[in-house]
């Protein structure tokens, strides 16, 4: 769950907006006690990118096949090959967290009102609104979805 550990943590322990009420996120259930402790004890603000945000924004096969050829072993291309292959669209769960952590004030995402996250014994997460809560969840409008998709295609294939 390591993310951008500055004054604010941006990560992607998932499914807080309750759009997928019975989704159990892998990064939560793989170490349930750690996830529960993390949300109960983390001392600084958290901005999390929920499962539903990364699910909406896809990396296209054309981008994965054509835009990462400028290096022999592009790490993103390798990850996509290992996960589902290059013939399938790929969700961008990790990339949404990275984009927010790197460019939080550029309007790529909205954020929810503050709240607290609970993680139950099955690994289901819930955000309960609370004015002094330390967790906010990324939100995504239709316009932001298009903008983030385009940004990913440009940034992930940019030659250094």
Question: Which residues fall in each region the model found?
Answer:
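N-terminal acidic, glycine/proline-rich low-complexity segments
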Residues: 1-160
């Amino acid at each position: 769950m390591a993310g951008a550990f500055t004054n604010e943590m941006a990560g992607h322990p998932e499914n807080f907006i309750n759009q997928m009420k019975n989704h159990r996120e892998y990064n939560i259930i793989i170490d349930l006690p750690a996830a529960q402790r993390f949300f109960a004890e983390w001392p600084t603000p958290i901005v999390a990118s929920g499962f539903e945000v990364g699910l909406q924004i896809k990396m296209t096969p054309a981008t994965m096949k054509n835009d990462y050829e400028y290096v022999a072993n592009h790490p993103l291309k390798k990850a996509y090959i290992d996960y589902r292959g290059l013939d399938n669209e790929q969700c961008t769960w990790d990339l949404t967290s990275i984009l927010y952590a790197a460019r939080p004030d550029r309007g790529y995402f909205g954020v929810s009102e503050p709240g607290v996250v609970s993680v139950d014994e099955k690994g289901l997460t819930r955000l309960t609104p609370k004015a002094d809560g330390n967790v906010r969840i990324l939100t995504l409008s239709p316009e932001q979805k298009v903008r983030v998709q385009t940004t990913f295609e440009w940034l992930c294939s940019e030659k250094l």
